[in-house]
Amino acid sequence: MLRVGRIGTKTLASSSLRFVAGARPKSTLTEAVLETTGLLKTTPQNPEWSGAVKQASRLVETDTPIRDPFSIVSQEMSTLANNIGSLIGSGHPTLNKVATYYFQSEGKHVRPLIVLLLSRALSAIPESERDRGTFDASDVTENVGELNPEPSINDPLSPIEILHGINPDIVLNPLSRPSDPLPYESNGILPKQRRLAEIVEMIHTASLLHDDVIDNSATRRGSPTGNVAFGNKMAILAGDFLLGRASVAIARLRNAEVIELLSTTIANLVEGEFMQLKNTIVDNSEIANKATFEYYIHKTYLKTASLMSKSCRAAAVLSGARNPIVDASYKFGKNLGLCFQVVDDMLDYSEGESHLGKPAGADLKLGLATAPVLFAWEKYPELGDMIKRKFDGPGDVERARFLVQQADGLSRTRELAQKYCDEAVANLDLLPYSESREALRNLTMKMMNRSK
């Protein structure tokens, strides 16, 4: 229940308020706040706009707190690791151990959480408005007994004996083992959307195994990395194996557009890593600074935002939603992914190793120029030479960190992250109101305040 009074015990975060004040079409909350206070006619061009927004933030109160995003899809998240385990099992015990190593730690699992929440939010769209393409029989919830079901996401496309390989009588992996059938629909989330969330986490984990080898990382989430625990060769092979298993699961979704989207994300991850290994700076000019920053944003999209954006679009495609919703879902994932990584780059300068669960200041030590140092470069041209030599000179890392702190590098990085955060929140406008949509907004805004 919404109450509007002179003093509210709870106020909206600034980013939430910016969304409320600029919502199009205006939400019930917007109308209640602005109309009640007589500020409905106020516009951003009006000198009183800033004061109006601040006043609105003090007047909004809701009796119904926003639920923790995880709790809304807790059932699906609680079975995530087990379901993935059934997809990636191998006949080789060592490969099993390495491939499942990162799934055993307490990770954030942000990507599958986003896919599941978005899928549930998409289920609030009336079925009459979800007519982009056709549903597979395995995703239809009514009159199941009267259908001639098409193959499910657990059924192979090729003959079992082909997938088995040389010995068709031996069961080595889940490609040929029958899986327990998934419920037709649970919590508003379709079986293919749940499988999508699992695939996304598999792709992400494979990229972590590979990244830790490339970066020679020693710890992740407070534990030894895969390359430290098992060696570089095993870690690389385990990452490859995960991508192979993910590719099989992608194919079994039997949706050409989704297959294209997810296959592209794998290529994007590799492209982004290549971009990170390369340096584009050629001189210390303003043009070089701008080009380097654009390069950084593009690399960030490929390495982080591509998987989020394309998996969000895939969830919308599987829901049957129309093109405007599908496009908005993609933009939401893109902006959220960029916000997530920009905040991550900022934390590398502001948090310690014990808090992050991984070495602090790692980017500079790896020779990487991220947003904080690129912004500081505009004020301190000497950073250009350090970027060019990848901070490999004596004292470069310490000097660069000092200059970032002296300049406005961190504050401008926060502003950039906030921009992406606000855009991601606005991208959710097209979705109908639901608990899951509000949880996505809450999750997005919390990205700005995370400390690890």
Curated annotation (Swiss-Prot):
An all-trans-polyprenyl diphosphate binds at R220, K303, T304, Q341, K358. Pathway: Cofactor biosynthesis; ubiquinone biosynthesis. It is found in: Mitochondrion. Its main location: mitochondrion. SUPFAM superfamilies: Terpenoid synthases (SSF48576). Binds 2 Mg(2+) ions per subunit. Its EC number is 2.5.1.-. One of its GO terms (molecular function) is prenyltransferase activity. The keyword Transferase applies. It is an enzyme of class 2 (transferase). GO terms for cellular component: extrinsic component of mitochondrial inner membrane; mitochondrion; polyprenyl diphosphate synthase complex. CDD domains: Trans_IPPS_HT (cd00685). Mg(2+) 1 binds at D211, D215. Gene3D superfamilies: Farnesyl Diphosphate Synthase. One of its GO terms (biological process) is isoprenoid biosynthetic process. It holds the Pfam family polyprenyl_synt. Mg(2+) 2 binds at D211, D215. InterPro entries: Isoprenoid_synthase_dom_sf, Polyprenyl_synt, Polyprenyl_synt_CS. Its cofactor is Mg(2+). Isopentenyl diphosphate binds at K108, R111, H204, R221. Keywords: Isoprene biosynthesis, Magnesium, Metal-binding, Mitochondrion, Transferase, Transit peptide. Belongs to the FPP/GGPP synthase family. Assembly of polyisoprenoid side chains. The polyprenyl synthase of coenzyme Q biosynthesis catalyzes the formation from isopentenyl diphosphate of all trans-polyprenyl pyrophosphates generally ranging in length of between 6 and 10 isoprene units depending on the species. This is Probable hexaprenyl pyrophosphate synthase, mitochondrial. The lineage of its organism: Eukaryota, Fungi, Dikarya, Ascomycota, Saccharomycotina.
